[in-house]
Amino acid sequence: MKLPEKLGPIHFIGIGGIGMSGIAEVMANLGYTVQGSDANDNANVRRLAENGIRTFVGHRAENVENAALVVVSTAIRRDNPELIEARERRLPVVRRAEMLAELMRFKSCVAVAGTHGKTTTTSLVATLLDAGNLDPTVINGGIINAYGTNARMGAGDWMVVEADESDGTFLKLPADVAIVTNIDPEHLDHFGSFEAIKDAFRRFIDNIPFYGFAVMCIDHPIVQDLVGHIEDRRIITYGENPQADVRLIDIDLKGGQSRFRVMIRDRRPGFRMEIEDLVLPMPGRHNALNATAALAVAHELGVPSDAIRKALAGFGGVKRRFTRTGEWNGATIFDDYGHHPVEIQAVLRAARASTDGRVIAIVQPHRYTRLQSLFEDFCTCFNDADTVIVAPVYAAGEAPIEGIDRDSLIAGLKARGHRDAVALERPEDLARLVAGRAGSNDYVVCLGAGTITQWAYALPGELAALQG
């Protein structure tokens, strides 16, 4: 039995979240009656309202009066008045991942998992399948610039989704094709240990059907080890590793883009082919790897090489993934969502490879618990930045932790040899700090998952204002 077509209204608590908004949008396009509430009147809420979805700003019990079903995200607390009201009314309450899983039953599905790179890889898979005339439905964890949204309703048989591992619910997703980009220590507040995280990814791969396949990056040692523990499922490996089935070679990262070619070697004896002259208009080895994962899926699903090449060259990127926000005095300002040390290191390495100028990193650490658990990694992930400007920690609802803050990170950076790490006292001081350091050909990269994205977009104008 599939989700009844006449079920509704379906009420989303936290409808403005990036994951929730995508599911709500696709369900509305499928003909379901959808409504929802959010604490903030953000861009996602406004977009949904413009598309005819009933939205409420603020959480109140009366918002669920006519609901037949309630969908909640992991960010919603048990004392939320709408959730309390729904349970008093004995309404079915489902998690975001459960509703996503129901949608996935309508299509054949590609699920993209991994600690980093999920959103970009999901966008790339969608782009390549679209180029192959497969017209996929897409539910992503970020805004795909070509669509102007994080969700897209396609007429084809395939769906591409970002599989969020943060609370373990990605194990509920019925994927036919799985991608694992990497596995690093993250979300330890939920999993408790790195071993539990690795076990969850193993089960994620085991869940694919016998007729499906998994695409896994063996450049990452934890993923390569996981490959050795998977039995009875088809695995396609990718990476720069000479043993990869889909191998990234001859990569050139100059000029703010990635040029490379890919060699495909099937386990069938004698099969080998190359796809040459690939250009991705995004810098960074990590993005070339993301593109290789997407290429592996597209090739397996029959997308021609010429279509892959053309689609990669025209890829419009994802919002908040090395997004250019403006220029000042010959320097270019970027906004990036990177908030884990591995992500920060990859972004700054890409910036370093793309310019002959200086790299200035502005970081707003996200969550005290993350800074505490990965403190040593944070102290060493900024080596490719000539200057690091550190803002106060974005708490995301957490209580402060003694000895874990902006100043301790600055001290840690300096203790490990960084030559220029400075404190940002207030957002209003940022333009002055940058103006004293940035010049022609420099890259100014704003990093974090909090309010720093607003600073990144305001910074070009603020710098111009300093010059009068």
From Swiss-Prot:
Reactions that this protein is recorded to catalyse: UDP-N-acetyl-alpha-D-muramate + L-alanine + ATP = UDP-N-acetyl-alpha-D-muramoyl-L-alanine + ADP + phosphate + H(+)
Annotated positions binding ATP: G114, T115, H116, G117, K118, T119, T120
Lineage start: Bacteria, Pseudomonadati, Pseudomonadota, Alphaproteobacteria, Hyphomicrobiales
Origin species: Methylorubrum extorquens (strain PA1)
PANTHER family per the UniProt record, alphabetical: UDP-N-ACETYLMURAMATE--L-ALANINE LIGASE (PTHR43445:SF3), UDP-N-ACETYLMURAMATE--L-ALANINE LIGASE-RELATED (PTHR43445)
Keywords from the UniProt entry: ATP-binding, Cell cycle, Cell division, Cell shape, Cell wall biogenesis/degradation, Cytoplasm, Ligase, Nucleotide-binding, Peptidoglycan synthesis
Alphabetized Gene3D superfamilies for the sequence: Mur ligase, C-terminal domain (3.90.190.20), Mur-like, catalytic domain (3.40.1190.10), NAD(P)-binding Rossmann-like Domain (3.40.50.720)
Main function: Cell wall formation.
Molecular function terms, GO-annotated: ATP binding; UDP-N-acetylmuramate-L-alanine ligase activity
Gene: murC
Pathway it works in: Cell wall biogenesis; peptidoglycan biosynthesis
Protein name: UDP-N-acetylmuramate--L-alanine ligase
Family statement: Belongs to the MurCDEF family.
Principal location class: cytoplasm
Enzyme class, broadest EC rank: ligase
Entry's EC annotation: 6.3.2.8
GO terms (BP aspect): cell division; cell wall organization; peptidoglycan biosynthetic process; regulation of cell shape
One cellular-component annotation, GO: cytoplasm
